[in-house]
Amino acid sequence: MADTVSKHIDMTTGSLWRNIPLFAFPVAATSILEQLSNLIATVIIGNFSGDQGTLAMAAVGSNVPLTSLMLNLFIGMSLGSNVVIANAIGRNDQNMVKRAVHTSILMALVGFVVIALGEIFAEPMLTALNVPAETMPLASLYLRVFLLSMPSILLYNFEAAIFRSVGITRMPLQALAVSTVLNIGLDLIFVPVLHWGVAGVAIATAIAYTVSAATLFIRLLKTDSVVRVTPRDLAIDPVALKRIVKIGLPAGIQSAVFAVANIIIQSAINSLGTEVMAASSAAMSLEYVCYNLLNSFSQACTTFVGQNHGARQIDRCTKTLKVCLVEGGIVALTTIIVIVGLGREILSLFNSDPNIVSIGYIRVCSIFPAYAFSMFYENMSGYLRGFGISLTPALITMICVCGIRFYWVFCVFPHFRTFANIMMVYPISLGTTAFFMVVAVLLCHPARTYRATQAKATAR
């Protein structure tokens, strides 16, 4: 069934106050659905793996930092496709749209390289993460099988970026919703019935993502939108590839930096004992929802600015940032009030132990208010990326997030070994990042720079 162009969100005309939430909320729902699928898989593997339940959960959990690092890198790369295609649509450059779309589809082939490297380096990578010897066989098995899904995961994310560049955000959500139901169903067959353990969970993930990627590919073949895919045109275009990598690689590194920094923090948390680990894990589940909501406005900012920059509607680019800051701020404030206000009650649903609830609430009170800073720098970063400025926000994130968190864990934490102390690094690093991101926007001032360039060109 072909999609009609009327289903997309018009980013260059109409109300930004209405269109940005219409874009952002399906993006947020897609990310939250992915987290929900992973959470349910963990519950299934923990409850239906017999005597190996705890070991199986540890095996899957020990892979999270590694898989998150890879996924963040490549999902960031897909943002490059989003910006390049959105900008070309704004310029009405259908030739570049076509070349960028078909190049993006083939970029998912990088997933096969990841499979090959993963098969070779699975155990060395897990050893570097200090995975215990008794967990290593299952952890290595899970990673090797999970990596088989990498081409499908990459293809899905590049396809989703293509659809979002033209303002179609519900379709990736619908495809993922179907695959999530399939994933949970397969988990319930492969683990409790067939007793495949961690391999069953990884196989279910691979099948589910293959279905979602295939669904979006078929839609791209049938769509009457400008991003339609024609198999005979599938080729890597050097110009399109260079533009995508120029924006996408720094964005991918920026996302991966968070994963690296969080690995370091998690190692410090682990050193404080099992109770702290359990409390921190429960609170972290709430953070994913909040972060995905805020990040969806950043993605909206990137895409809307990209299209309007291409269409030379620079005033609308600036207004996009303002709208994203206001609406993202409202979402952030609402989430902070609800979670902090009901934090103890929500945490008790994960674990009724009063001590664990109290420890988890320390994390809630430390991190959730700091998401106000996160909202600022995510939207500022998205604004710069929409203008094609991707390296600057990546460098700021690397220095302010990774640098401060590394320093805190290795230089401050050893002298004050408390959970509250390690949690302080979040507001400090996020606040510093937000400050320098605002400075970067004021110094780069892409809208003013664009107008000055156009004025000089006109004068000639």
Predicted regions and their residues:
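Short alpha-helical transmembrane segments in multi-pass integral membrane proteins
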Residues: 1-24, 85-149, 182, 193-249, ...
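Transmembrane alpha-helix boundary and packing residues in multipass membrane permease domains
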Residues: 27, 31, 43, 83, ...
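Helix-terminus/linker motif at the lipid-water interface of multi-pass membrane proteins
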Residues: 32, 36-58, 126-133, 189-196, ...
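Small-residue-rich hydrophobic transmembrane alpha-helices
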Residues: 57-116, 120, 153-172, 266, ...
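Short runs within selected transmembrane alpha-helices of multi-pass transporters and secretion channels
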Residues: 75-78, 145-164, 172-180, 201-216, ...
